[in-house]
């Protein structure tokens, strides 16, 4: 029997419905908001795999073209590999749910979200998160939920709950907040240099407005929820852990507090071999899973105890210390802009590339939102960056997620298309990794863009703040320590990875990941202000190397020539099936874009190529404009000058004084009838006739060739 719960959520109503669709799943809920609807199912197996030592949670979100009344793109006209949007939404669903499964619950679990209907106004990602929580709540799968998700915006100082795509375009912040009844669990988003004080207010506002969604899920679970299943939870073998502590605590302490990551890993690997052999002598029936679990548990205990009691970290730093920073720019000769950003043992090589607007990425956004992107950032994490051998395939979900975080952190300072009509791409190659590579990408990306001459509004830097909590109890926050600029090991054994990027004025990008069942807002606020302090230090380091964009773009980057044609002539320039414009591009070697208002942009790194393309376009559809330069033919010579003809555009006069920089006594000594010359339109006389200058055209063309 279908059951549903309705709640007012922002300006609209959110509806949770279960018992109608996908009834064979352990839990199934359809969430509707406006005319956007997402079906989310949860299934968990009842058979535990032997030696399974982690929670194999798989979260997949998919958007169907039919939901928006469209055909899929591509040759086969069907949905294929997940898009970046689908992957990012899957990650947003996964991250707040993972800490809420019982400790030791290692049963294979799958959560699937499917977009059923898209109204093009409301982003389905928030509904998918709420649906996943609700599906687990009505199922028999053990789960310490529910959680509620909301998107928050701010327009003209006014908070907006679940802003539409159009509202998000003008909002000062785009915050996705996921929280429990008591604490935040996950946040993600971007902002336009948002002040830290206002950011904390946004979190408080969001926390208030997830409570209705949480209450709705509780009510639905009370109506139709199944009793939670009994299951076997993996428990650490305390006898082995205690014995390891007796025998190896001192050696583990020394190994963990080795400043070099490589040396630390070697010591820990050697120690594990030794202690495994020793434990098997004393505990012959111990499984590899039990030994590894106890070994990791002891490392974690030693690490956390040291941080809490001595405030000393593995590399000798204090809680708020930043690792040494080294920066270089212009490190790749043929790149349009590049930088090498090193923070401790984390190293990011970032390269910026400029191209025509034709290279902007077209998106199949079935759920609405932007349909194209002219600024792209791609993040690559090769296995050698951590000293490993691995498969080289397409980008992983993690790489896509890290790239998206860095991209939205830099986007608020990217110049508008009007001010800088280029498509822009930053690629980040992580060459060494020991924590916080996404924030290194933000710093390196900002430096590379400035090196490329992109007129950024200001520099952007990022830092990650970690956390070690004293007690496991959810509500006991009497003892904790926040760590600035965390290492990979601190991320692994710590409780939080809070990435925040921004400028000197405020925050531009953020992402919170927790291993706990939430964190108090006041602790989050301390982390936010701690990151602000660190960001200023990093920006100072960056500004010492490059504090403003280069005055000129790279000689290898395409230059731009801008022409205005009458909109009625756009079709003539494009030609049937794009034949004409493609021919001009092929013959000139330039890339050409055409806007609906008749603006034609010509891109080429060669001045000759630019001139050739401009000449061909002008010959075909151009109109004479003051300041324009044209190839013309001399049709008659007079004592006072010469008359020229511009193909398809009529005639005009070049006065004798405009023929050359040097005095001219006889016109026929400079030009002859039938000769082709370059002229610049310098005005219109009182009768509406164009006046041209040969010397002005030659001077301007010479200056362009010298660039």
UniProtKB/Swiss-Prot annotation:
Residue ranges constituting the S1 motif domain according to the UniProt record: 622-695
Name assigned to this protein: Polyribonucleotide nucleotidyltransferase
Oxidoreductase listed as a keyword: no
Cofactor list: Mg(2+)
Organism of origin: Methylacidiphilum infernorum (isolate V4) (Methylokorus infernorum (strain V4))
Reactions it catalyzes: RNA(n+1) + phosphate = RNA(n) + a ribonucleoside 5'-diphosphate
Function comment: Involved in mRNA degradation. Catalyzes the phosphorolysis of single-stranded polyribonucleotides processively in the 3'- to 5'-direction.
Chain sites annotated for binding Mg(2+): 491, 497
